Regions:
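Active-site phosphate-binding and catalytic loops of NTP-dependent enzymes
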Residues: 13-19
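Short, structured protein-protein interaction patches enriched in aromatics and acidic/basic residues
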Residues: 22-31
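Short strand-turn-strand beta-turns centered on an Asx-Gly dipeptide
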Residues: 33-36
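Short beta-strand-centered aromatic/proline hotspots
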Residues: 42
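Extracellular interaction modules
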Residues: 49-53
């Protein structure tokens, strides 16, 4: 789909505005709603959509900037709330480490799949709770909270749990499953 959008911009409508960067599904910036489903434009193959007509929309649940571009700031502000970095209790050791914080394979596997998130906001756009409650922290922030809680090197579990333990955090999720 991204190649088709580039073709349209170069040959048919130079005013069409969208985002695209890596063209291989690693940056997440080309997220759109394609035929009603949030997808990455660079990863979505037109032939596999099995239709003659393709409808493109900007991601839902985020403010529109122009055409197919949305403002990701509300999404990233919610991610920032959960402190998406390793928290250590000993700040001297944190800033001047005396050793590596090694992990076993099992410890790494506990959170590995959650570390692959592109922060593309597709889950956020698909979430019916985010659509009806702008204060809801969203699926990406909840997933990222778990990613750090499950990391054996992190000591911020209680701090993060306090952030999401409320109606706009984990208790606000209606378990619709649209995010996955």
């Amino acid at each position: 789909v991204l190649d088709a959008m580039i073709y349209i911009k170069e040959n048919m409508d130079k005013t069409l505005t969208f985002r695209g960067s890596c063209r291989m599904g690693t940056c997440g910036i080309c997220g759109l709603v394609i035929n009603g489903k949030p997808r990455l434009a660079c990863e979505t193959q037109i032939l596999l959509l099995n239709t003659d007509t393709i409808y493109l929309e900007p991601l839902h649940n985020l403010p529109l900037v122009k055409d197919l571009i949305v403002d990701h700031i509300p999404f990233f502000e919610k991610q920032k709330k959960i402190k998406p970095y390793l928290i250590r209790n000993d700040m001297e050791e944190y800033w001047n480490p005396t050793r590596e914080y090694l992990q076993t394979t099992e410890e790494h596997l506990r959170y590995m799949q959650f570390s692959y998130c592109l922060t593309c906001a597709l889950c956020y756009a698909a979430c019916p709770t985010t659509a009806t409650n702008p204060s809801f922290i969203g699926p990406q922030a909840l997933m990222n909270t778990y990613r750090f809680i499950a990391d054996s090197r992190d000591e911020g579990k209680l701090e993060r749990m306090a952030i999401i333990n409320n109606p706009d955090g984990c208790w606000g999720c209606h378990l619709a499953g649209a995010c996955s």
